[in-house]
Amino acid sequence: MNTVLNNGRNTTCHAHNVVAHDPFSFEHKSLNTIEKEWKEWKRTDHSLYVAPIVGTVGSFLLKKVGSLVGKRILSELQNLIFPSGSIDLMQEILRATEQFINQRLNADTLGRVNAELAGLQANVAEFNRQVDNFLNPNQNPVPLAIIDSVNTLQQLFLSRLPQFQIQGYQLLLLPLFAQAANFNLSFIRGVILNADEWGISAATVRTYRDHLRKFHRDYSNYCINPYQTAFRGLNHRLPDMLEFRTYMFLNVFEYVSIWSLFKYQSLLVSSGANLYASGSGPTQSFTAQNWPFLYSLFQVNSNYVLNGLSGARTTITFPNIGGLPVYHNSTLHFARINYRGGVSSSRIGQANLNQNFNISTLFNPLQTPFIRSWLDSGTDREGVATSTNWQSGAFETTLLRFSIFSARGNSNFFPDYFIRNISGVVGTISNADLARPLHFNEIRDIGTTAVASLVTVHNRKNNIYDTHENGTMIHLAPNDYTGFTVSPIHATQVNNQIRTFISEKYGNQGDSLRFELSNPTARYTLRGNGNSYNLYLRVSSIGSSTIRVTINGRVYTANVNTTTNNDGVLDNGARFSDINIGNVVASANTNVPLDIQVTFNGNPQFELMNIMFVPTNLPPLY
């Protein structure tokens, strides 16, 4: 038997990418460039049944929330989704979903849906034409007032949205429903923002503020419910679960999470929900009951800055003996994930083996972050003489490619996303582990057998100034007066870690920290810009609690109870509200600690869901 230890590192340099990394690259990118990148993604990474328009629309809406320009979002959205009046892109979304979930509309229902798409396009186009006429009275016939057009279109939306909620096809039509809801909520937001220019009364503006609150709530709850029902019914291999989740997050929940931020303006959304990709190695079947553990395993160290991974691998060749075929077998025995500051994860895989590979970015990972992975595995047979059991384990930064084993199969990449963590699973995970999700930053070795599949965690998070001495992120505030968000899971440190968990959310631009013990303190570190902001915390406190916030030596307190006083969205057990903590200053050119302490008044269920620094001159729309 001949054993080959793969101690080398395969690297490929892409010279065209050797540029200084821009922590606000997404904000500086044109919509035309974004559209081209999603089309190229579809052309080269075709394994996922996702129409590229869904990624473009998500990016477009994020840019609009982060901008003060372009109040007429509805007109731009029409040109994106219905170019030249065509419904082809919406039909492409439907066909992709039919392929993905293996369900088709019957002929009559398909006819109804296509008619509704055509009607939606015509209604939006007519409204935009009427607004153009109203704003250009010297060129076109002028309507006496735009309010009639506004109210008419709102009623048309309310009559058309139910046509994408047909009984028996809720999951299949969910991506189309989400796009139709994008139109309706963008329209409502536009009415509020354009009220002065359009001559809309204060009373009508109040009505449409109420509409924005109500329909964000109703549409969000509708999207969450069929997804959760479908996910709970899964009993699949890990790649199937992750693919289903990624598909629905790109097609639906990217939008749902943005809707909750439509009340803000000029707010840079600096991170979002994770997208996951895995290899296809043999593992046990998992159910939704196992998901809380898997979820915790994949992002238990999401607040650290990824630097690479190390472990043990072998490629073994069994020679032709007694007429048996030559057999090549590649095995990843164990892996540890490494972060800046000398921090490493627990071991995934076999124990008591010597490390024989170490992959790192070579350069500062803030300048050359990981962006792409190859994680597939399979078996090749060359007649009856040779059989090869191969694994792929390759990772690409913006500069170089590194391999545990050579890159093969489909790559995992999403435009404007970065690989912010790596994890993995063994062939069989113990029931004891599956029943006990990892707490925040927990170090727990998983498995006693070889790694069956690695998992890469993709996130939009990019505005990282530097790393704290413990290896965690320092969040960079924009240079201008744009507001920004910080994900609660990207903390510098949290005390009471053993009773702090990451909780999955669908309508929140990422996940929450769930505190199960009173008086935890979560610290975040910001690189300030000297600007003053209104600090909002999105929290779910089902029961009474007191929040104490400390920044720049000032202390702010707020008593909260969101049991009934909330936005109306039930997001995986959370009922949230955005709490205005007060006016804070992000001191310039220094690292600013932000401490958030929570005291329970009784026994509430408490989750910290988002941290938002909102420009003081742009209060929320409701």
Swiss-Prot record:
Gene: cry2Ac
Endpoints of the signal sequence: none
Molecular function terms from GO: signaling receptor binding; toxin activity
Chain's role: Promotes colloidosmotic lysis by binding to the midgut epithelial cells of lepidopteran larvae. Has low activity on dipteran larvae.
Family as reported in the entry's similarity comment: Belongs to the delta endotoxin family.
GO biological process annotation, one example: sporulation resulting in formation of a cellular spore
Remarks, miscellaneous: Toxic segment of the protein is located in the N-terminus.
Name of the molecule in the record: Pesticidal crystal protein Cry2Ac
Assigned keywords, A-Z: Sporulation, Toxin, Virulence
UniProt keyword annotation of Protein biosynthesis present: no
InterPro entries referenced in this protein's UniProt entry, alphabetically: Galactose-bd-like_sf, Pest_crys_dom-III, Pest_crys_dom_I, Pest_crys_N_sf, Pest_cryst_cen_dom_Cry2A/18, Pest_cryst_cen_dom_sf
